[in-house]
Amino acid sequence: WYSSMFAANIKQEPISHHHHHHHAHHSHHAHDSNSNASNSPHQSPLPSPNPPSHTNLQLEQYLKQQQQQQQQHQHQQQQQPMDTLCAAAMTPSFSNNDQNSRGWWSGLPNPMQTIMPANMRPSPTATAATTATDCCAPTTTAAAIALQANDKLQALTPPMDVTPPKSPAKSQQSCAEPEKEHDLMSNSSEDMKYMA
């Protein structure tokens, strides 16, 4: 559900943006010709500057809205599927981290699936990650930067701190068993510090 909503939102945004733009343009044209035809030439300067400013206002509001939406998406991305996103984004990007992150991830599926709702299972989230890559590069770049930062943090703090809501159960489950993976992880992120 989450990933499909996410993909739908992302796909709709550019379309609705274009549509909105055209729509505003049309109404502004119609308004222009109407005002010129029906109103006296005296008044036509008033309505004709009016629609553009109105359009600009609409567009500004819409852009602000879009920015907020994108920020929300970023927050959602970073809060909810952070761990899946971590695995998805780190595995292709950092060859040095490849095996380590895979090993670390393979140690986690059970606790993750227990804690995450069904829609947060690796496969849908992976699709959400790919949609993000395709549709809005900025968000993904920001997420990747955040991931790098998180990776550096993981050298100092265990990954559970990234997702507070899941931390208690996860820290018990994952720390009890795949501690080797955590050591690998912190080593590799220290390597990354020197690489980056």
UniProtKB/Swiss-Prot annotation:
Gene Ontology terms: biological process: segmentation
GO CC terms in record: nucleus
UniProt subcellular location: Nucleus
MF terms in GO: DNA binding; zinc ion binding
Composition-biased stretches (Basic residues): 17-29
Sequence ranges of Basic and acidic residues compositional bias: 177-196
The UniProt record lists the keyword Lyase: no
Chief localization: nucleus
Location of region: Disordered: 16-56, 63-82, 156-196
Keywords: Developmental protein, DNA-binding, Gap protein, Metal-binding, Nucleus, Repeat, Zinc, Zinc-finger
Domain of life: Eukaryota
Low complexity: bias regions: 33-43, 65-80
Free-text function comment from the UniProt entry: Gap class segmentation protein that controls development of head structures.
Similarity annotation: Belongs to the hunchback C2H2-type zinc-finger protein family.
Protein name, entry field: Protein hunchback
